[in-house]
Amino acid sequence: MDDNNYQILSQLRENVISKMRIFVDKNNERFFSDNELLQLSDIEVSFLSRNSISRHGLTTNLDKSKKLSPSNCKVKLNKKLFEEKYFLYAEFVLFHEYIHCLGNFSHDKNFRQLENLWPEKKQMNIIGRQLTRELQEIKAQWAWTCSKCGFVVKRSSRKFRSNYFHKECLGKLKNIPIIRPTSLEH
Ligand SMILES: [Zn+2]
Ligand SMILES: [Zn+2]
């Protein structure tokens, strides 16, 4: 990882952890202790590979035979989160992964309650859906469809000109994305 990426990721870590430090319940008790936050700050964070392009973030056990914990996990984030328009959302994704790191494996009620501590959670969901759509577009295959006879050619690139015709019947071809459902967030 080059210096620039390293800086971006450590800044993000710092931002998220300093927000987590101020989350308190109605008795003014903190949700995340200093010790937990210290452990979280030591977790390796890097970028997702192209194979997991449709995910926003992913937490995995380092040792698959042991339970998920701050000392037994690593976090990967989608590189697209570091485009300026997604920067605030990136904090939310890392927060989500940090909740997993603390041993909350599934998205159960307790998990969602912690997740809801994040400010502007609704806005985060909206931006999240926008990112999902963008990632789906990148992954989509394209179908050149003949408007006259219905003939379909699949293409992996969106490169297309509006004046393409089907050789056999001379119908005009249209370019339609084939969108597959993305894997669940985790
Ligand atoms: Zn045709
Ligand atoms: Zn998750």
Regions found by a protein language model. Give the residues of each.
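Metalloprotease/metallohydrolase-associated module, dominated by Zn2+-dependent proteases
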Residues: 6-84, 88, 105-186
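Active-site recognition of the HExxH zinc-binding catalytic motif
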Residues: 92-104
